[in-house]
């Protein structure tokens, strides 16, 4: 998917309207608890400033449901950006309207302003053409650098592109397309995918799409128990999607047909309840006790999975191996994270597909030891399912 990027156009003296993803977590005093999304947008932002463009940033934050709500103001993000850049960032009091337009027109080369939360207007998520046109009127160039919302056809990601002559990808989106695209279309082999998470239903399309691409799939997380039940194994009290058992059987058959090795755990860590002080033990998957729930992959599985990962040239990871939020059920997830870091050291391309896996690798302190951590949860998932992302499809080729 070749899209024009910031590097392909001249920015000097131009009003550049950039969609970023500043949907950052805030504490009750409205302090930002994690600024990685703002930091991630810095290369694109700096490029516009250095080239003398006039930068207008827009984003959403949280779910204000189409109403103005000061708790969801982007002011803390503008303040943090100003600190990171070491220069002022003007904060607008809305994202459309005459007053905002006057501020936009007053911008000088190399200056930056931040529009207020797009989702204070219901028209944003409705992809309303008039709202999109009004946003577009503020800029001469549109840049989308918000991969996290690229799977949504909203006014600021899709609608706006109909009303600007130039619509290009920012560096963050370019990097996402490069790594996720390479993984899907041009991977060095062996190519191993690790899929975790609670439910098969959330990962069916990814599994089916990856069967045409990968050599091996390692499965973890609670979704393994639906596979085990499909194979007639005891699952105790583990989470099972009973309405997906037929599907699990067909996925196992499909993997066989396509010559993909679908590897399931051989042992699991079980406990009677999901709590930090529950007594846990390791059991083979052939004899999971009644009343016990599987909450992580066991040591023998960790060893097998680590070996598979270390033998790979390309690794894609999406979804944790267990309830990693609780330390005693986090060993499997952290061991996979460590194996990915070791594989990267050995020259493999390692890609973390956003969402919980990104949180897990950050918790393990290994985010900078892998090739690429995707910034989009739902967007990475849809990309890995082979779906077209409207926010990217709409950009200039």
Swiss-Prot record:
Keyword Glycosyltransferase: no
Residues annotated for ATP binding in this entry: 203, 294, 325, 354-357
GO biological process assignments: gluconeogenesis; glycolytic process
Main location: cytoplasm
A molecular function (GO) term: phosphoglycerate kinase activity
Pathway assigned to this chain's UniProt record: Carbohydrate degradation; glycolysis; pyruvate from D-glyceraldehyde 3-phosphate: step 2/5
Broad EC category: transferase
Binding site residues for substrate: 21-23, 37, 60-63, 119, 152
Keywords: ATP-binding, Cytoplasm, Glycolysis, Kinase, Nucleotide-binding, Transferase
Subcellular localization(s) per the UniProt record: Cytoplasm
Annotated catalysed reactions: (2R)-3-phosphoglycerate + ATP = (2R)-3-phospho-glyceroyl phosphate + ADP
Annotated TM spans: none
Recorded GO CC terms: cytosol
Intrachain disulfide bonds: none
Annotated EC: 2.7.2.3
Cross-referenced InterPro entries: Phosphoglycerate_kinase, Phosphoglycerate_kinase_CS, Phosphoglycerate_kinase_N, Phosphoglycerate_kinase_sf
Subunit and partners: Monomer.
Family of the protein in this entry: Belongs to the phosphoglycerate kinase family.
Protein name, UniProt field: Phosphoglycerate kinase
